[in-house]
Design a protein with these regions (language model features):
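Aromatic-lined substrate-binding rim segments of carbohydrate-active enzymes
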Residues: 30-31, 47-99, 210
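Aromatic-lined carbohydrate-recognition surfaces of secreted/lumenal glycan-active proteins
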Residues: 6-20, 79-87, 141-145, 192-237, ...
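Catalytic domains of carbohydrate-active enzymes, especially glycoside hydrolases
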Residues: 24-51, 131-139, 251-252, 311-323, ...
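The substrate-binding groove and active-site-proximal loops of carbohydrate-active enzymes
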Residues: 9-22, 48-63, 107-126, 188-204, ...
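Hydrophobic targeting/anchoring helices
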Residues: 37, 45-46, 149, 217-390, ...
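A conserved amphipathic helix/loop scaffold
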Residues: 387, 392-393, 406-407, 415-659
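Short, acidic/polar
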Residues: 19-35, 119-132, 236-243, 305-316
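Active-site-adjacent "subsite" loops/lids of carbohydrate-active enzymes
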Residues: 64, 79-135, 144, 148, ...
């Protein structure tokens, strides 16, 4: 069973709020939503975490509300399902009356949610899910509280878990002792690894309990999971999705890639969300239907934008998403307050666009410089990929395509940016990357020097507080750029024999104007591993104004060119902040442009690796429409298409003669 069979090539799961006493209003909202958008699936959101005593009293109120809505939408196009919005619960329990079940104990010793090992709590969840399954929902989706932490703190160290841990490992820990051992454990520590196994088993067993309750009624009902926000659970959240899936059903997992705030000043954060989405696809994309976590939750009137909701959807579908979990579109919140219908308008306008884009992505592969992802990081810390680095922070706003990959053996041009990125990789992984073609920034160069890799980069790098100069790359046919060190000093390079220097930090004599080189700021080195390493004295930990300029963009075009003709590929040449994503195929290429500037792009200036035969833009209705274009420079083409602020057009480029 494939998720596409539920709705189409791209499936929306619209979460509708529990609306006790206003079920007729909810049913009308759902019918209107389906008729306008063509998206039939609505999941009624039920916060099933146990509250009150007996907890089933509140649960039965929600189940009865679901039954009323189900009866009201019978005979309509609505396909009704359930979001188990909270089972374990997102937060600590604060009820006045509470069931006498075991509470989870977090790593700081505080109590939080009900423990999934408690038999009474298990019986409650089993019965509630069984009753919901009897209503024949089209889908049951578990929310992201099915996880092993709450409030950002690791669980569980309660008496039930400590007993299970000691029995499995032949130990005699108390809760306090186990918490201390886990908190101080390092990678490879047998106690830490044993706890991680129990931690994972607890979450997966809870998902299996839900699946078993569904199966006791109807094994054919599909179910899905939502990825939690903590990176160390994101690594193995596909296991939860597999545990929830029906037999023969493709596992469905909503990614944790939302920014939850659609207003303009957050829009450029789309680059870091794009990078994270790329990492999820690289790590979990095979055999898993990944859904976008879309930014439609209506927090308040200052955070709503259907335009940027659409742009986020475009980026995720372009990267491979096959569905989306959206919140409260066309609904009413508590008190009868209508959710902004701008979300409905956008989904109605683009109802043909989203499935057409999902179909077009098939048969193409992500293109651009590779930012490596690392699934190895400490329990409770780190992330699969570092953000606000050269890839998403600089290239993502300079129109230079990038991608993220966890498979470091893959050939291509890499970029290693930031000290934390280096710390996340083993020596063997760093060797593998340095055997490719790779761009290294100042922070990564200093970190590699500390790790003993200077012999493989050709550079011994250290930050030098005395360096605050202009930067020259006249030798590369360029021009001077201002180089400032407000937040972090520049890096000084001591270069090995055989290193090619192509730019320098220079001191400008105040009397003569003579430019004297102080240290190389851009070097190229062919190492013993067979790799080509280009290192630049450029840190991303500076002010935005000093990080971005047309000169700096041209500099990086030149630098990437040193890594081979395929390192750059497509690139946006407009003099304003924008993200450019690219995919390459045998017969066609796809390019998506995201305008981050409040000013429109009057036309699209696109550097192309080959001369286009034709350029088409995907219309709102899902039909590819031809665009006029002309060559304005070597390999640069002007496409007659205006992009408004936050616009996100997708172009299909059919290629002809290569340059």
């Amino acid at each position: 069973m494939c998720v596409a069979a539920l709705s189409g090539a791209f499936t929306f799961y619209n979460i509708m709020p529990w609306n006790e006493g206003r079920e007729e209003e909810s049913a009308r909202d759902m019918v209107e939503y389906v008729e306008r958008t063509g998206n039939p699936i609505c999941l009624y959101s039920l916060p099933m975490h146990a509250e009150g005593r007996p907890a089933m009293t509140r649960a039965m109120r929600m189940i009865e509300s679901y039954r009323k809505v189900r009866r009201l939408v019978e005979g309509t196009p609505v396909k009704l399902g359930v979001l188990l919005q909270s089972t374990l619960g997102h937060w600590s329990r604060v009820d006045r009356e509470i069931e006498p079940w075991q509470r989870t104990v977090r790593i700081d010793g505080t109590e939080a949610r009900f423990c999934p090992l408690d038999p009474g709590f298990q019986n409650y969840i089993r019965e509630a899910v069984r009753l919901l399954a009897a209503e024949k929902p089209v889908m049951i989706m578990g929310d992201d509280d099915i996880r092993g932490y709450s409030g950002g703190k690791l669980e569980c160290f309660c008496p039930l878990h400590v007993k299970a841990f000691n029995k499995a490992n032949g130990t005699h820990f108390t809760s306090e002792q186990l918490r201390e051992a886990v908190e101080n454990g390092k990678e490879g520590d047998p106690i830490l690894e044993a706890f991680v196994r129990l931690h994972r088993k607890t979450v997966c067993d809870f998902a299996r309990l839900i699946r078993a309750a569904i199966d006791s009624v109807d094994p054919a009902i599909p179910a899905a999971a939502c990825m939690p926000g903590m990176a160390w659970e994101q690594k193995w959240s596909p296991l939860t999705a597999k545990a929830l899936a029906a037999k023969g059903q493709e596992p469905i997992l909503r990614m944790g890639n939302s920014q939850y705030g659609e207003i303009l000043h957050n829009f450029s954060e789309l680059t870091s969300r794009s990078l994270r989405t790329m990492a999820f696809f690289s790590l979990h994309g095979d055999g898993m239907c990944l859904l976008d976590e879309s930014d439609s939750f209506p927090q308040n009137q200052w955070s709503k934008s259907g335009t940027t909701l659409h742009s986020k959807l475009v980026s995720s579908i372009f990267l491979g998403a096959r569905g989306s979990k959206i919140w409260y579109v066309n609904a009413h919140k508590s008190g009868g307050i209508p959710v902004s219908r701008v979300y409905t308008d956008v989904l109605a306008r683009f109802r043909g666009f989203y499935p057409a884009l999902a179909e077009a992505v098939k048969g193409t592969d992500p293109a651009g410089v590779i930012s490596p992802a690392h699934p190895r990081f400490p329990l409770g810390a780190g992330a699969m990929c570092d953000t606000h680095t050269l890839a998403d922070g600089i290239f993502g706003t300079m129109g230079i395509p990038y991608r993220c990959d966890v498979h470091l053996e893959r050939d291509g041009a890499y970029v290693l940016s930031g000290e934390m990125a280096v710390e996340g990789f083993s020596d063997a992984e760093l060797d593998l990357m340095l055997s490719h073609r790779i761009l290294v920034d100042a922070d990564a160069a200093v970190a590699l020097t500390k790790r003993g890799f200077s012999g493989k980069t050709g550079v011994s790098a250290a930050f030098d507080p005395s360096l605050k100069f202009k930067e020259d790359y006249f030798d590369a046919g360029g021009f001077p750029m201002y180089f400032t060190a407000v937040r972090k000093p520049a890096a000084r390079f001591d270069c090995a024999a055989g290193v090619e220097e192509f730019s320098h930090l220079v001191f400008v004599d105040p009397e003569t104007g003579k430019r004297d080189p102080v240290t190389p700021s851009g070097v190229k080195f062919a190492n013993s591993l067979g790799g080509t390493v280009v290192t630049v004295a450029y840190s991303t930990e500076q002010y935005w104004a000093y990080l971005h300029s047309e000169q700096r963009r041209d500099y990086f075009h030149y630098v990437l060119g040193l890594l081979g003709p395929d390192a750059l590929g497509y690139a946006l040449m407009n003099p304003q902040p924008a993200q450019c994503l690219a995919r390459r195929g045998k017969e066609r290429d796809l390019v998506a442009v995201f305008n981050f500037c409040p000013d429109p792009m009057r036309s699209v200036l696109l550097k192309c690796p080959v001369r286009p035969k034709s350029v088409r833009r995907l219309g709102d209705d899902g039909v590819w429409k031809p665009c006029a274009f002309r060559e304005i420079g070597a390999g640069v083409f002007e496409i007659d298409d205006e992009i408004p602020c936050c616009g996100a057009p997708v172009y299909r480029i059919d290629s002809g003669m290569a340059y």
